[in-house]
């Protein structure tokens, strides 16, 4: 599989499921001020995905969990724990996040998925390095559907 790299807003992608780069889910979601993709999900999709996520409990580093999309036009959201408790990403957390998100997508039969650059925002990972880790991992996974990696482009 060869992922397509695009520039834009993940929330505007025409896919069945999006990936949200989240945290370990040990701090109650309502105590956090979501940024990046999480902030966009909250603003445009409402609180339902985060309430559902909060009921899932802690997520292992690199783990992934599925929630509904709230008011967003997707079938679901896959939240990945791409950053550790110190809010930092690593090669392992990024690769594990990609692999576990794809495992959920395949198990659920989704044919299209869009990823942000996991760990490149809040996680302080260098975007080019994170992109390479993600590409390497995605290329090693058998998937017949469409995979997009979205580099954020702000509005305005």
List the predicted regions and their residue ranges.
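Short gly/ser/thr-rich secondary-structure transition/capping motifs
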Residues: 1-8, 59-63
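Solvent-exposed alpha-helices and their adjacent loops that cap or buttress functional pockets
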Residues: 9-12, 69-72, 139-142
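Short, conserved "active-site rim" segments that organize catalytic pockets and cofactor/ligand binding
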Residues: 10-57
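Conserved acidic residues
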Residues: 16, 75, 111
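Conserved, mostly hydrophobic/aromatic
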Residues: 19, 78, 115
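N-terminal short beta-loop-beta anion/metal-coordinating cradle
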Residues: 49-74
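Short, basic/glycine-rich phosphate-binding loops at helix/coil junctions
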Residues: 72-85
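Phosphate/ribose-phosphate-bearing ligand recognition and processing surfaces
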Residues: 83-156
